[in-house]
From Swiss-Prot:
Stretch forming the signal peptide: 1-26
Gene: APOC1
Function, in words: Inhibitor of lipoprotein binding to the low density lipoprotein (LDL) receptor, LDL receptor-related protein, and very low density lipoprotein (VLDL) receptor. Associates with high density lipoproteins (HDL) and the triacylglycerol-rich lipoproteins in the plasma and makes up about 10% of the protein of the VLDL and 2% of that of HDL. Appears to interfere directly with fatty acid uptake and is also the major plasma inhibitor of cholesteryl ester transfer protein (CETP).
The keyword Transport belongs to this UniProt entry's keyword annotation: yes
Protein name per the record: Apolipoprotein C-I
Species classification: Eukaryota, Metazoa, Chordata, Craniata, Vertebrata
Cellular localization per UniProt: Secreted
Annotated disulfide bonds: none
Gene3D superfamilies cross-referenced by the UniProt entry: Apolipoprotein C-I
Pfam families the UniProt entry points to: ApoC-I (PF04691)
Family: Belongs to the apolipoprotein C1 family.
InterPro entries listed in its UniProt record: ApoC-1_sf, ApoC-I
Broad class of where this protein is predominantly found: secreted
Highest rank taxon of the organism: Eukaryota
Amino acid sequence: MRLFISLPVLIVVLAMALEGPAPAQATPDLSSTFENLPDKLKEFGNTLEDKARAAIEHIKQKEFLTKTRTWISETFGKMKEKIKTTFT
């Protein structure tokens, strides 16, 4: 019984292995890869730009980060004034 079931399975597996890759799975030739390269790079650049802008806007809108940035600016300004008055 086991041999009766395993032989058709083995035949199907061998047929699939010997058939090779499907046309959609075949690797593209080098020239078509180079033809599509500028479009892919432009798409990648646009996606990266959009994500970077969204991240920067998200950081700018965070209340904690806004307060921290303000505090650092004020502290730096105070230090600058203190150094200016000390060495003048």
